[in-house]
Amino acid sequence: MDEEDQLIQPQDQSCWATLPDVCLRRVFWWLGDRDRSRAALVCRKWNQMMYSADLWRYRTITFSGRPSRVHASEFESALWYVKKFGRYLEHLEIKFLNPYNAVLTKKFQVTMRGLLSCLGKSNNRLKSLSIQHLELDRLVWRNSIRSSFMKSLSFFLKKMGKHLNYLSLKGARLTTEQGCHILNALSYLRNESTVTELNIEDCFSHHLAVYSSPQFNKTMATFRNLVSLTLNYNCISDELLENLCDNNTGTLRTMNIKCHIHDPHGQVIWGMSWAKLARHATSLKVNFFFERVMKYERLARILLQEIPIRSISLRSCYFSDPDWSMRPTLTDLLPTFRHTLQKLTFEFNNNHESLDEELHLLILSCRKLFYFKIWAFLDVKFVERILKSREEGQCALRTLKVRIYTNRYETNEEDRTLREIYRKYRKLIDSELNYFVIAYPMM
């Protein structure tokens, strides 16, 4: 018996060598790429495990937008991965973080051209693709680089669009024409797309009135199987709602709509358009996210009573306007949706007005409300009132997150009161609530 035969005798092997495949696969699943590569050198069985499809179905590839020796190999390793294991991919997420200059955007574009080309040739099972926050309208994206990247992406989507269920181009920042060109690639030669979840939030650049574009409405008419749609309010029009009603009523369940102060949002939408969509898409729930759009007059034009609203987020990002009041929104507008509202998120600077009573009454009126988050100037006793109402069964909250702004640097008094409130309602909080409350100096 030679030396090699002696090495593989069962009595001389480690217990790791006979580890069942299901256990070994789980071990590999938790390892990073570098450790997986090292583990694959242990023996033939471990090397074969490296090619298990389960290990490579999900992948997030992150490219740093800053020149660095530490990140120098990111582009090469991404290509290596796709060439080696790309055929197993089902869910791919690409991140390119804050590109610093045109040299890096060019390197990213060339890498993506190779990556998408290789993936298009070897993969026929990709279900989900996410390429977020590219901000292609920035100056670091020269016209030639941007055009080349879009050409590669469009060609890839034409080939792989029939497999995709999910596509996110969040933060791409394209012109209306460019964005529609990319989205049309999904329905190439088929006149309709199979995508069920589409995220085009911030896909188009700020200041664009996308809702007035016939090209955009024609493009959206190719989506016939949408379950979830995420977009900006500057894309919403009566025509879009009509398209959704005609083509997606049997499937559409969720619409996430972002409205930013810099996006055009003065268009007139008829309540009957929303009512028709809600009547046909009976499972539809709409979630609104407002950023610095806080005035009652603007909100009232957007939040029509015919909309089946599930959640509303209002964030002013610390901006203060002494001529603005949140009170009419809390007392007159939001109670309109008390039968459907389940989540409320507020972040505003109300240093000039107290809103504790109005907020409390709003929570009590929304009987389905289970999530409430607020960052604002509040009295500490507001938290105790909410907990008391919850204990008495007057509201259905399961999540309560509060940041209480104060005008003092020291929050010792507020902290002490909050500890007393916690001790008083500890049993309720620990057993039934996702609870986080803190006092925060707003200097």
UniProtKB/Swiss-Prot annotation:
Subunit structure: Directly interacts with SKP1 and CUL1.
GO CC annotations, alphabetized: SCF ubiquitin ligase complex
Name of the coding gene: FBXO39
Keyword vocabulary terms for this entry: Ubl conjugation pathway
PANTHER family in alphabetical order: F-BOX FAMILY PROTEIN (PTHR10706), F-BOX ONLY PROTEIN 39 (PTHR10706:SF160)
Cross-referenced InterPro entries: F-box-like_dom_sf (IPR036047), F-box_dom (IPR001810), FBXO31/39 (IPR045048), LRR_dom_sf (IPR032675)
Any Pfam family the entry gives: F-box-like
Domain named F-box: residues: 16-61
Function per UniProt: Substrate-recognition component of the SCF (SKP1-CUL1-F-box protein)-type E3 ubiquitin ligase complex.
GO process terms (BP): SCF-dependent proteasomal ubiquitin-dependent protein catabolic process
Record carries keyword NADP: no
UniProt protein name: F-box only protein 39
Coiled coil: none
